[in-house]
């Protein structure tokens, strides 16, 4: 498998595109992350194969839970919920962050740029299997320094599990996380 995630990823949207061909046939999340939410929704219960990528003491190997754990390292306290709009070719992403007033989930548009921008990268790395290739452009975009360092750690752990990762970055924090 091969995934390329461009620097100009989708920002927060009111809904995201579905593509059964890209998501099921090609196992792609889109060069701009446009199918990341659909991929996560349709593969949420699959187990992560790369043991090196598994998050800390988290007992669940489910894809969605592992993605949430890693997103939580980059943007603390995040949980996700996908809302399928039935026969539409669109799907919604709802986000909850610990510390928000109330226990509500909010649309991606109402929680800032970082989560939407980083989700395709985290998903690509967590779902990757040994022998796959991932090319990432500017994974540090819209992340604070700690989030950039954690992104570097995630990249390094994917590579330790046999995933070939090519990264174009201008961030010392990403490089420090990889070390």
Cite the ranges covered by each PLM segment.
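Walker B catalytic motif
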Residues: 136-139
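C-terminal lobe/lid and adjacent interdomain/linker elements of RecA-like ASCE P-loop ATPase modules
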Residues: 150-179
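The start of beta-strands in P-loop NTPase/AAA+ ATPase cores
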Residues: 132-133
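Short, charged/polar micro-motifs that form catalytic or ligand-binding hotspots
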Residues: 57, 105-108, 141-142, 164-168
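Active-site Asp-x-Gly
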Residues: 109-112, 148, 153
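Phosphate-coordinating catalytic segments in nucleotide- and nucleic-acid-processing enzymes
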Residues: 1-118, 124, 129
């Amino acid at each position: 498998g091969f995934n390329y995630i461009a620097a100009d990823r989708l920002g927060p949207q009111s809904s995201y595109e579905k593509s059964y061909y890209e998501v099921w046939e090609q196992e792609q999340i889109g060069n701009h992350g446009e199918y990341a939410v659909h991929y996560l929704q349709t593969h949420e219960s699959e187990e992560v194969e790369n043991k090196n990528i598994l998050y800390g003491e988290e007992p669940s190997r489910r894809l969605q839970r592992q993605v949430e754990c890693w997103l939580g390292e980059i943007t603390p306290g995040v949980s996700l919920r996908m809302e399928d709009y039935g026969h539409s070719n669109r799907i919604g992403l709802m986000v909850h962050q610990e510390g928000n007033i109330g226990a509500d989930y909010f649309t991606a548009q109402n929680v800032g740029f970082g989560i939407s921008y980083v989700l395709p990268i985290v998903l690509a790395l967590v779902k990757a299997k040994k022998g796959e290739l991932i090319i990432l452009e500017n994974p540090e975009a819209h992340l604070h320094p700690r989030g950039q360092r954690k992104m570097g750690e995630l990249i390094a752990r994917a590579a330790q599990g046999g995933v070939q990762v090519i990264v174009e970055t201008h961030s010392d924090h990403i490089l420090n996380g990889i070390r």
